[in-house]
Amino acid sequence: MDADEFRRLGHALVDWIAEYRERLESLPVMSTVRPGEIRARFPAEPPRQGGKLAEAVASLDELVLPGITHWNHPSFFAYFPSNTSYASVLGDLASSGLGAQGMSWQTSPAATEVEEVVMEWLRRMVGLPETFTGVIHDSASTATLTALLCARERASGHGQNRAGLQGGEPALTVYASDQAHSSVEKGALLAGFGKAHLRLLGTDAEHALRLDLLEAAVEEDRARGLRPCALVATTGTTGTAALDPVEGMAALAERHGMWLHVDAALAGTAMVLPECRWMWRGVERADSLV
C-alpha cells in the first residue's frame, strides 16, 4: 500500500465508521448470529495473495457487523462503560500512525512525558494530593495485578522477588469483599498468593465490606502465623456500584502494616465532581489506586 491508497482507504474507513455511528441506534444491541456463523463466512484457506484491503473494508458490513455486540449503543448497559468517542478513534489512528513504542523515555521521549502530563491532569481533576502520580495501564485488571505485586514485595522485603514462592517464608494473605471484581482474585492468583490465602469477606446491607469481619479475619490469620499483606477496597462494585469504607480500611491497613489498594475502575470518574468525593473518603491514605 502506498500513501495515495492509504489516504483513499483511510477516508473510506472514516466514512464507514461515521455512517455506522449515525445508524447505531437502529441496530439490535446484541448480535443475533449463532456460534460459528461468522467464522463459516470466511474461506477455510488463507488467501494466496494479499493486498486486497479495499475488499476487506468493503466486507465489514457483510462479514463483521452482523457479529458485533454494539458496546456504543445507547441501550447497552452491560459490564463497564466502554464507549469510544470520535476523538478517541482519531487518537488511536494517530498512535498507530506514529507506531512508537513507549516502554522507556529513550524509546520515545514524547510518549513518556505526555503520559506524565496526562496522569498529572487526572490527579488534579479527581482531587488527589500531590503525593500521587501514575502510569497508564492497558486495563484495570493489569493495574490491580501490579498493585498486588508491589504489596507482595513490600511485605516480604523483596524476598519473593529473590527466592520466589519457594522461599519458605510464612504465607502472605490478601483481603477484599465478596463483591470485589474478578480481577482481584485473578491478580492474587497470578501474584502467587493462591486461593487459600485470599479472603473474600461478607458485606452489609449496602453491599459494602464489613470492617468487623475484616478485622476478625486479619487477627485470625496473624494468630495462625500468616502475614496479612494487602487490602483491596472497591469504590463502585461491578454488581451494585457499592462503596467499601475506604477510610476505615485505611486505618486498619496502617495499624497492621498492610498495603491498601483502591479499585475505583467503575466509580472513579465520578470524583471529577467534588460533591462525589465522599464516596472514596480516605483515598489519600491508599498505597495504590486504579
Segments from the language model and where they lie:
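Residues in well-ordered beta-strands of folded domains
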Residues: 78-80, 95, 135, 175, ...
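A structural signal for alpha-helical segments
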Residues: 1, 5, 106, 135-138, ...
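Peripheral, non-catalytic segments flanking oxidoreductase cores
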Residues: 84, 101-108, 112, 124-141, ...
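N-terminal entrance/gating region of PLP-dependent enzymes' catalytic architecture
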Residues: 1-131
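Conserved PLP-enzyme active-site core in the AAT-like
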Residues: 139, 143-290
